[in-house]
Amino acid sequence: MDSLLTLPLAGEARVRILQITDTHLFAQKHEALLGVNTWESYQAVLEAIRPHQHEFDLIVATGDLAQDQSSAAYQHFAEGIASFRAPCVWLPGNHDFQPAMYSALQDAGISPAKRVFIGEQWQILLLDSQVFGVPHGELSEFQLEWLERKLADAPERHTLLLLHHHPLPAGCSWLDQHSLRNAGELDTVLAKFPHVKYLLCGHIHQELDLDWNGRRLLATPSTCVQFKPHCSNFTLDTIAPGWRTLELHADGTLTTEVHRLADTRFQPDTASEGY
């Protein structure tokens, strides 16, 4: 938990980050989730990014990398980004199995670090909101105490906080019951540290950009199936898979953009009522 990744980027005016989330890979590459072959959609996303891969200083993978909790699924994830020069850090989602995830990704040379120092101005902290076996999230007392310690010992660093589950309602009642259950406790910790201005999550398979008590909360599309916004019941969207790029600036500001495939072949089974 205390492992640290340091990116010595002194003199850089900005840091570019690639976020990939909710790949939902299987041990068998031919398998599909809700009608979408997740390996093929992941590969299509990576192929769209690849011409620009030299631009990124860091890759962040924000959970649900595997659908079937297999070691092979995590190996496939690592295989996909193996040619990217930027280091990758990760956190678990509700579908992940952490023993297999940790082992397979570490064997592939992917860092288990949950704290990243970027140059002299920024840090990224990755939180584990998984409650194993259920879809909702919660931050343990240990996680909250760890977060408070790390924020307190680097008050001079602008901070980007990563977690899988969304702490604010996304506007989908079926999905919001699977949000971060103790968001109030997280808010209490963050209220002490005004240098935390940005939070980034996955989980909801859609784009989100909200204000949370003066902090900017961002969520990012999945590389496979998409959930339709503002729906009371489980509803799939036909919009293409996506990813997010972020730029961290020395003055503490953040700029970001969501990208989607131009490819329209990854259409889900819209008759599905859940998974």
Could you describe each region identified by the protein language model?
Residues 21-41, 67, 97-110, 132-141, ...:
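Acidic/histidine-rich helix-loop elements
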Residues 61-82, 97-110, 172-174, 208-213:
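Metal-dependent catalytic neighborhoods of phosphoester/phosphodiester hydrolases
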Residues 45-58, 136-216, 252-255, 264, ...:
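His/acidic metal-ligating clusters that form di-metal
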Residues 2-5, 44, 100-115, 145-147:
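Alpha-helical scaffolding within the catalytic cores
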Residues 14-27, 122-131, 160-162, 216-221, ...:
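Active-site-proximal beta-strand elements of phosphoester/diester hydrolases
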Residues 2, 189, 211-275:
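Binuclear metal-dependent phosphoesterase catalytic core
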Residues 22, 63-64, 93, 164, ...:
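Active-site glycine-centered loops adjacent to acidic/histidine catalytic or metal-binding residues
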Residues 1-76, 170:
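N-terminal active-site segment of His-dependent metallophosphoesterases
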